[in-house]
Swiss-Prot record:
This is Small ribosomal subunit protein uS8. Part of the 30S ribosomal subunit. Contacts proteins S5 and S12. Belongs to the universal ribosomal protein uS8 family. One of the primary rRNA binding proteins, it binds directly to 16S rRNA central domain where it helps coordinate assembly of the platform of the 30S subunit. The keyword Ribosomal protein applies. The gene is rpsH. The keyword RNA-binding applies. Gene3D superfamilies: 3.30.1370.30, 3.30.1490.10. Keywords: Ribonucleoprotein, Ribosomal protein, RNA-binding, rRNA-binding. InterPro entries: Ribosomal_uS8, Ribosomal_uS8_CS, Ribosomal_uS8_sf. Disulfide bonds: none annotated. Transmembrane segments: none annotated. GO terms for biological process: translation. SUPFAM superfamilies: Ribosomal protein S8.
Amino acid sequence: MINDIISDSLTRIRNAGMRKLETTKLLHSKAVEALVGIFQAKGYIESFNVIEEDKKKFINVVLKYDEKGKSVINNLKRISKPGRRVYKGKDEIKRFKNGYGTIVVSTSHGVLANDEAYKAGVGGEILCTIW
């Protein structure tokens, strides 16, 4: 049984990128679907779709690579964990890696990227960073 589905999903994406796989399959949850949606909107993955196998839902993620065949995801790190939650205010999540990276934040408005959370004027739990 998996205790932290977000960490599991990030690890599956990271491992698939290192092995240069075209796709990877993640366990489905609303939080993971929102997280992958942000990754797609920011250009870190090609696409994703929800599939159902044996009455279980999965998210099929198509990874994105540059012209040299290297994954566009350089680093993917879980910040807030079940044993140690990390919360930040809107002013603390304004920029990350001089705008080249993204912080994914769980807010009262849903799961948002750092620039969207800043524009909405909300802070929240820092789920992960990606660049």
